[in-house]
Regions:
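Conserved phosphate-binding catalytic cores of ATP/NTP-utilizing and phosphoryl-transfer enzymes
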Residues: 1, 91-121, 244-248
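Gly/Thr-rich phosphate-binding beta-strand-loop-beta motif of the actin/hexokinase/Hsp70
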Residues: 1-24, 113, 120-141, 157, ...
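Adenine-nucleotide phosphate-binding core of ATP-dependent small-molecule kinases
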Residues: 28, 173-213, 223, 231-232
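Cysteine-cluster motifs in flexible loop/terminal segments that predominantly coordinate metals
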Residues: 269-289
Length: 290
């Protein structure tokens, strides 16, 4: 499989991933405050790839910033920058309301998760917002839930009250009771988000009739779920793997017109220590403790 530079532009940060022979070999993350610096980093990563003229694919939940980055990358490299949505379809089927618009990150995460585990699963993306999405046993994205992320919730409490301070999210101190205002806020957000995910996963399992594998990704995933028995694996770069999986499906469909772009697997797979074996980067909490 040829090389690929995958760029995921989020609300606050951009991730740049270099793929060689389906393996994610390098990742750079930068704040979005300077799109030119992000484009320069992408140019450097592109030039480091072994294949001259490697394709560049950009996904975005923040189109104004992504447009600036994509234009600058094209100017710097002379390469065509493909966009998820316009040029590359997320490699996942959906069962949603007609004309529903779903964030690219949610669909790409679903594509990567399904490619990795090949069975019903939930993807929890703990970033600026937290999303909890369900993919059924034939690889169809069924939708899910969206809620404020940890930092957004803390900021909202500060901005909409007179007395609550501005604080940054982190894991609260040990113990069930916040012994001061700051710790009480952290307890409320931290345990509240964990409880939200538990309740939603139980709700999905009851409707589906089986308990799904649960994968977590996003900047706050490790802090929220590294000690949570509900989550089977933490996959830091799931969106980048979703870009690669979607580009791979499009590439294979173009190379072999008779082959469908997305193949529905029916075999089940377990998330094992060390990952699923499909190069998606998943690792269980057992790995972290080993």
């Amino acid at each position: 499989m040829p090389t690929l530079l995958a760029i995921s532009v989020g609300n606050s940060r951009t991730a740049i991933g270099s793929f060689t022979a389906s393996e994610l070999t390098a990742v750079t993350r930068l704040d979005n405050v300077d799109p030119i610096a992000v484009a320069a980093a992408a140019e450097g990563a592109w030039k480091m790839l072994d294949s001259a003229g490697a394709p560049i694919v950009v996904a975005s939940t923040n189109d104004p910033t992504a447009d600036r980055i994509a234009d600058e990358v094209e100017a710097r490299t002379g390469a065509e920058v493909l966009r998820v949505g316009a040029d590359v379809a997320p490699a996942i089927g959906t069962h949603l309301d007609a004309h529903a618009k779903t964030g690219q990150d949610r669909l790409l995460n679903a594509a990567a998760a399904w490619s990795c585990v090949k069975q019903a699963c939930v993807v929890v993306d703990a970033g600026t917002a937290i999303t909890v999405d369900f993919i059924d046993g034939v690889g169809t994205f069924q939708g899910g839930a969206i809620a404020p992320g940890a930092q957004m919730a803390l900021r909202a409490m500060h901005e909409h009250t007179a007395a609550l301070p501005s604080i940054s999210y982190r894991e609260p101190d040990a113990g069930s009771f916040g012994k001061n205002t700051e710790q009480a806020m952290l307890q409320g957000v931290h345990v509240g988000l964990q409880g939200l995910v538990w309740k939603l996963v139980e709700q999905y399992a009851m409707q589906y009739g089986a308990f799904p594998v649960v994968l977590a990704t996003g900047g706050d995933a490790a802090t929220l779920f590294c000690k949570d028995e509900l989550v089977n694996a933490i996959v830091p770069d799931l969106t980048l793997h979703g870009i690669h999986e979607s580009w791979r499906a499009a590439f294979e469909a173009e190379s072999e017109p008779s082959r469908p772009a997305v193949q529905r697997a029916t075999a089940t797979a377990e998330v094992r220590p060390g990952g699923c074996g499909d190069g998606c980067g998943c690792h269980t909490k057992h790995d972290d403790q080993a």
